[in-house]
Amino acid sequence: MEAQSFGTLNYIALFAYLGAIMAVGVYFARRQKSADDYFKAGGRIPGWAAGFSVFATTLSSITFMSIPAKAYTSDWTFLIGQYVAIAILPIVFWFYIPFFRKLNLTSVYEYLERRFDVRMRLFGSISFMLFHIGRIAIVTYLTALALMPFIDISPLMIVFLIGVLCIIYTFLGGIEGVIWTDVIQGVMLSVAAILIFVVICFNVDGGIVEVFSMSNQADKYFPAEQFSWSWTDSTIPVLMIGFFFASLQQFTASQDVVQRYIVTDNIDETKKALITNAKLVACVPIFFFAVGSALFAYYTQNPELLPENFNTGGILPFYVISQMPVGVAGLIIAAIFAASQSSISSSLNSIAACFTSDIYEKVSKNPTSEQKLRIGRTLTVVAGLLGVVASTYLIMSNESEIWDAFNSLLGLMGGPMTGLFMLGIFVRRANANSALLGVVASIATVLWVRSATDLNFFFYGVIGTLMVVIVGYLTAPMFKNNLNSDEIDELSATKEKRSTTAEKA
């Protein structure tokens, strides 16, 4: 199908948003005087803003478009995963956050060196950086491809607008600029979802009652067969287990989210961040699924409005461009840009934090704060350009399958990283060598399962995590622990309540 005419007012709305985001980066640039400012915001971020940032960071543009498409073509079962993510937050708060705050970390992978050794720290940090460079490329690439059929902006220009502007405002504003732009972007995403749903309901004969009635009649909420157990399909029990471990990885072992725990002034503000994120996750995704149901009702009543052989994966941007009022459509497309930029900017700053803390400080002798700030900004540019170049290559060569395979392989590192933190915090007798054996066993097992079985991919993270913990526990007596009992107490869950109480005081 031919691209829709985007229109002058839509362009004005889109570029007004992009200009506002740039202004935020410029504003916060003057506060970036040290590495602590650039990576931790000097502890100046209020808890509610950090929570908004976590929400925006974990919601990419692909999610923003794919959830309505999923509800349109299938059902609401994936909504279960959002509430599983909320369920793990008490675990994160009581057993993980006090360690990250008490140890005054810049990179979360510093914990792995203190608990085990430098090998585990480098494994975690390098895996994270490689994965997120790939993630930048994939998010930018898929956003460009998704929008290309519907607006008269070339995919290369979309990549440029998303990637280069992210580099600039992240370079200037550091984590503080990233978080406050995340707040803007999170608000835009939420308002956009609600606005689209309301507009569609007004255009459906019978309104909101008919929207939900039609979905109910078509059994598009939680079909009975989705409650059965399956080793190969993404049924509700599988989703609950898979999302539990996936969320645990994101909230305990991923620098881009964990970094939000240390930008607040105290642990009570960090608690507010988790509560704010939980409230947003509990409410906003429902509207994304509801948009899918509304689109189903609208196009069931108006099937002639869909082009022949239409790819329903792009149902949301198609409706926005073809049916939303001029100007409003531009703001909605800006929200899709916002969803991608919030993920990318967080990746850029967290990559810079990991490289500076985990690698540069290891090879440089006592670098000054100014030197670390300079390296952090340099890595922001380098990581961003690598992502943009990779995304451009994918668009020009149309070799997405190769890159997807590479990104999928790096994604297998998530389970081992989650397992390492779990092993360190909950298994006192674990040591560096048993942790290494656990990681090797985890990667080998997941690669074998992936290639030799039809097991659902949601089980990969489960297997990867548990293999590290089980092998790390069983092999620990074979090796001497290089930490004494007091050091293990300091780095394990045994003193969790005392540490939390002390920090509050």
Swiss-Prot record:
Quick one: which residues bind Na(+) 2?
D182, S342, S345, S346
Effect of knocking it out? Answer: Deletion mutant cannot grow in minimal medium. Mutant fails to persist in the squid.
* Predominant location: membrane
Gene Ontology cellular-component terms for this entry are: plasma membrane
Keywords in alphabetical order: Cell inner membrane, Cell membrane, Ion transport, Membrane, Metal-binding, Sodium, Sodium transport, Sugar transport, Transmembrane, Transmembrane helix, Transport
Q: Which family does it belong to?
A: Belongs to the sodium:solute symporter (SSF) (TC 2.A.21) family.
The UniProt record's further free-text remark is: Complements an E.coli nanT deletion mutant.
Name the UniProt record assigns to this protein? Sodium/sialic acid symporter NanT
